[in-house]
């Protein structure tokens, strides 16, 4: 069994297409999509791409899908910072008749992989799609969440930075982000099989991607191109930023 895990695509279809091409070459038997497929610049096209794949695909939801479902149902997306709400509203308009496509996605997905054991996929933590932790978060803050899971491996995303660490007896691996990576341009994802877990990075044509994103009508297109394609924030900068929001 070989599984690819992709997280935090955020409507960046060009990045997704490049990663999927790499995944096809790997001959995976299953794809796990770990939430925050949307919001982003090309939400409708990104959803259609993932839902039309000819490989067994499991989806889980992230905080992005929760915010969009709140917006589509008329509920106040209270967990969304004010500066991001125009993006949520715009994405919801693009997906006004498609909320049902992701409304049934579960919070977690589990599978047994020979050589790795039981693997749990979640968006942020197994209990919550919004919680923040990084490779530097103190283990004692995280043990109450990961102890007693009866899973050898947990795969997560949410913070857009790859890592591979131990929390108690559990191996916890962050897949990074396909569409909005921090650290360097490109797209991050995971490959899991009996030989282990590999952090993968895929390059793609950033100029062509920028042109498509700018033509999408996305209200934050220039900022997205600058911060998610051309010049992503450095890992050091984001670790410092997340240190103020991480689990205490």
Where do the model's predicted regions map?
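Core catalytic region of metal-dependent phosphoesterases/phosphodiesterases
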Residues: 2-93
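Active-site-proximal loop/helix segment associated with metal-binding centers of metalloenzymes
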Residues: 81-89, 116, 124-137, 210-212, ...
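Active-site neighborhood of divalent metal-dependent phosphoester bond hydrolases
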Residues: 53-112, 117-118, 135-150, 219
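Active-site environment of divalent metal-dependent phosphoester hydrolases
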Residues: 10-15, 39-41, 64-69, 153-166, ...
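Acidic, His/Gly-rich catalytic cores of divalent-metal-dependent hydrolytic chemistry
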Residues: 166-248
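Anionic-ligand binding region
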Residues: 136-178
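Beta-strand-turn-beta hairpins that frame and shape the catalytic cleft
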Residues: 1-4, 110-120, 167-171
């Amino acid at each position: 069994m070989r599984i690819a895990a992709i997280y935090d695509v955020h409507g960046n279809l060009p990045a997704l297409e490049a990663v999927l091409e790499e995944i096809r070459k790997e001959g995976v038997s299953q794809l796990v999509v770990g939430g925050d497929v949307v919001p982003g610049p090309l939400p409708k096209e990104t959803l259609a791409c993932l839902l039309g794949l000819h490989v067994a695909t499991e989806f889980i939801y992230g905080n992005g899908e929760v915010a969009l479902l709140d917006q589509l149902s008329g509920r106040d997306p209270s967990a969304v910072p004010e500066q991001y709400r125009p993006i949520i509203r715009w994405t919801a308009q693009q997906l006004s008749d498609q909320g049902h496509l992701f409304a049934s996605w579960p919070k977690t997905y589990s599978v047994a992989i020979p050589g790795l054991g039981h693997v749990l996929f979640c968006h942020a933590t197994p209990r919550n799609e919004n919680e923040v932790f990084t490779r530097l978060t103190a283990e004692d803050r995280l043990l109450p969440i990961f102890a007693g899971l009866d899973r050898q491996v947990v795969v997560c995303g949410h913070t857009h930075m790859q890592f591979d660490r131990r929390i108690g007896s559990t191996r916890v691996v962050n897949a990074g982000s396909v569409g909005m990576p921090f650290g360097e341009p490109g797209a991050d994802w995971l490959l899991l099989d009996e030989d282990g877990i590999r952090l993968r990075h895929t390059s793609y044509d950033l100029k062509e991607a920028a042109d498509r994103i700018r033509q999408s009508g996305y209200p934050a297109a220039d900022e997205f191109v600058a911060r998610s394609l051309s010049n992503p924030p450095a890992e050091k900068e984001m670790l410092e930023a997340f240190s103020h929001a991480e689990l205490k």
